[in-house]
């Protein structure tokens, strides 16, 4: 029995990677220094895993921006616009072209601007990947040299590595056809490209993982989380031929297919018969897969000698594992198959967890005992394996007993349960989940109150967090700035943001959120039942890192959280001022949520706390209140069987939070990049007066679903991408607005950026918003002509 890990956080315990990459972008860090810091982090992370008890460490999970983008580059699937010549670029033989990589990720400004690749959520997580673009003429130019170099780094340093790549069917499933062609028509060529990559890996790296199954060569982990989806039979049927082709290309390699995030369920028979050596199953989110797999393999069916990797430590949450429960699962497999056919692992890549609990110095000691970050999860994997083996010393016995005691203490802690919250939940009635009047009546009252033009302009909420704002926040934390002085600095920043918006000519203003470090962490610091880490960072996309709060107990609102800031902003302008809150679903999705009660109960607790805040904002004179739910779609379970219950709980929680206001108060919500086709009826059921959406990278394609389904309320499709520093032209945004106006009634359209502007700089923000306002003016004039 061996231990391994599917992936490790790449950002560094102190966000060293973020700082190095952003320094490179700004010209303060050389390429040599950037590559040196990346190599140092890789070595540090491999050592952390090995020292915690991981036998085989992942290589290829590290990326300067995104692992899907790295694979796209290794495949040579470069869209023509990223090549100076206009022809498809090929990095073959040159190693990783990091400037090309960053251009694909961020786009390029200048005289010949280039739009970046589209970005969207990685399955149901808060990680974002860059979507490969394909067309009928896409040709592959495979080059594994970047990954070969990393494997050699690991081997030279004495680690036992396994190469990690997204699998071919997952990569193709997640790609986007830009010309309407069938992307699966490229599968034969893609298989050839993968075969070339695998041959390059195995020929360049000596055997590193002998283990007596069917081969003893380099171990390669091919991630196929699409096996956790409700796949069409046509796609499911592709797996055997694809993996037969890959096995033939590298007969001596140790191939592992890894599925995670949900049960394999009806895809399990296909997975168990693939010509590979190891199959990884997520037993945290798909526990029933183990019984089904053991039944098949125990009957002598499936791939002969197939080993199972059992993901028994939760790779997506931070609570200590139930070691006894994990041991029972692994022991059942070992008893059925033999220990030599069982691997122990986290459920998925630890990319979604903070790096090291040891970095926390100020965390509440009681809550800290309940936690395990990535480094500690590797130790939990080792502990499970040692207990199952049954031969261990006093240290392992002590660790096992400590785990049991922590779980006992957490279950009875008075920090967890608040009787007042339970009583209030019990008093909720169904009428609290519905607005007083239907939208058709509300919009009349709102238009009379707000006096807005056709195509009103606004922003999503946040404005650039300048060095002065960040410095003030740091000074408050370290005690060198008093609370009064900090609040004065934030009021000054807020007033400046209001003046900027008035000068730009925006119709509905926001206060800009200078006081907020993060849209979820901020509220986690003010709600009872949460605690905040100092270094619990996880990667959201590229260099964007977030610090999810820890939701450990019953949730309530001790006092108003945002009212003073929004009310002050309202006092500075005669224009409508929009208040911003983060919705219950997003707070839950972007926090590390307790695992001892149902998610529905957590959502309703959050909704009641936010309901109080919405009511106080309305009482303070805020006529527009936005409750953001960018995570609603990403939280959707991957399997259809679980989706209805989730959506019902999510929509009811949103309505519970927002339905206590008068007809004239306009409720907005905001959502990020996602596929709305399968949930559009539920989005309509949220009954927000206005929904703003990320739409620019998809060229307004997502509006088609709103038109097809007759979405009844108002929509603000984003007209420019805030994830790139590029400033789009007036013509570009005008074209997008005209496209939107051709799909939806113009009297129900708003004009806004894709998302908040927190991560941008002021010069590009001013320029882009000025162009946006001018684009709206032009379209109004054209429509009035």
Curated annotation (Swiss-Prot):
<dbReference type="InterPro" id="IPR038071">
    <property type="entry name" value="UROD/MetE-like_sf"/>
</dbReference>
<feature type="binding site">
    <location>
        <position position="755"/>
    </location>
    <ligand>
        <name>Zn(2+)</name>
    </ligand>
</feature>
<feature type="binding site">
    <location>
        <begin position="15"/>
        <end position="18"/>
    </location>
    <ligand>
        <name>5-methyltetrahydropteroyltri-L-glutamate</name>
    </ligand>
</feature>
<feature type="binding site">
    <location>
        <position position="628"/>
    </location>
    <ligand>
        <name>L-methionine</name>
    </ligand>
</feature>
<dbReference type="GO" id="GO:0009086">
    <property type="term" value="P:methionine biosynthetic process"/>
</dbReference>
<feature type="binding site">
    <location>
        <begin position="460"/>
        <end position="462"/>
    </location>
    <ligand>
        <name>L-methionine</name>
    </ligand>
</feature>
<keyword id="KW-0677">Repeat</keyword>
<feature type="binding site">
    <location>
        <position position="513"/>
    </location>
    <ligand>
        <name>L-homocysteine</name>
    </ligand>
</feature>
<comment type="pathway">
    <text>Amino-acid biosynthesis; L-methionine biosynthesis via de novo pathway; L-methionine from L-homocysteine (MetE route): step 1/1.</text>
</comment>
<feature type="binding site">
    <location>
        <begin position="544"/>
        <end position="545"/>
    </location>
    <ligand>
        <name>5-methyltetrahydropteroyltri-L-glutamate</name>
    </ligand>
</feature>
<feature type="binding site">
    <location>
        <position position="634"/>
    </location>
    <ligand>
        <name>5-methyltetrahydropteroyltri-L-glutamate</name>
    </ligand>
</feature>
<dbReference type="Pfam" id="PF08267">
    <property type="entry name" value="Meth_synt_1"/>
</dbReference>
<keyword id="KW-0028">Amino-acid biosynthesis</keyword>
<dbReference type="InterPro" id="IPR002629">
    <property type="entry name" value="Met_Synth_C/arc"/>
</dbReference>
<dbReference type="InterPro" id="IPR013215">
    <property type="entry name" value="Cbl-indep_Met_Synth_N"/>
</dbReference>
<keyword id="KW-0489">Methyltransferase</keyword>
<feature type="binding site">
    <location>
        <position position="590"/>
    </location>
    <ligand>
        <name>5-methyltetrahydropteroyltri-L-glutamate</name>
    </ligand>
</feature>
<dbReference type="GO" id="GO:0032259">
    <property type="term" value="P:methylation"/>
</dbReference>
<keyword id="KW-0479">Metal-binding</keyword>
<feature type="binding site">
    <location>
        <position position="628"/>
    </location>
    <ligand>
        <name>L-homocysteine</name>
    </ligand>
</feature>
<keyword id="KW-0808">Transferase</keyword>
<feature type="binding site">
    <location>
        <begin position="460"/>
        <end position="462"/>
    </location>
    <ligand>
        <name>L-homocysteine</name>
    </ligand>
</feature>
<feature type="binding site">
    <location>
        <position position="670"/>
    </location>
    <ligand>
        <name>Zn(2+)</name>
    </ligand>
</feature>
<keyword id="KW-0486">Methionine biosynthesis</keyword>
<keyword id="KW-0862">Zinc</keyword>
<dbReference type="Pfam" id="PF01717">
    <property type="entry name" value="Meth_synt_2"/>
</dbReference>
<comment type="function">
    <text>Catalyzes the transfer of a methyl group from 5-methyltetrahydrofolate to homocysteine resulting in methionine formation.</text>
</comment>
<protein>
    <recommendedName>
        <fullName>5-methyltetrahydropteroyltriglutamate--homocysteine methyltransferase</fullName>
        <ecNumber>2.1.1.14</ecNumber>
    </recommendedName>
</protein>
<comment type="similarity">
    <text>Belongs to the vitamin-B12 independent methionine synthase family.</text>
</comment>
<feature type="binding site">
    <location>
        <position position="672"/>
    </location>
    <ligand>
        <name>Zn(2+)</name>
    </ligand>
</feature>
<feature type="binding site">
    <location>
        <position position="513"/>
    </location>
    <ligand>
        <name>L-methionine</name>
    </ligand>
</feature>
<feature type="binding site">
    <location>
        <position position="694"/>
    </location>
    <ligand>
        <name>Zn(2+)</name>
    </ligand>
</feature>
<dbReference type="GO" id="GO:0008270">
    <property type="term" value="F:zinc ion binding"/>
</dbReference>
<feature type="binding site">
    <location>
        <position position="121"/>
    </location>
    <ligand>
        <name>5-methyltetrahydropteroyltri-L-glutamate</name>
    </ligand>
</feature>
<feature type="active site" description="Proton donor">
    <location>
        <position position="723"/>
    </location>
</feature>
<dbReference type="GO" id="GO:0003871">
    <property type="term" value="F:5-methyltetrahydropteroyltriglutamate-homocysteine S-methyltransferase activity"/>
</dbReference>
<dbReference type="InterPro" id="IPR006276">
    <property type="entry name" value="Cobalamin-indep_Met_synthase"/>
</dbReference>
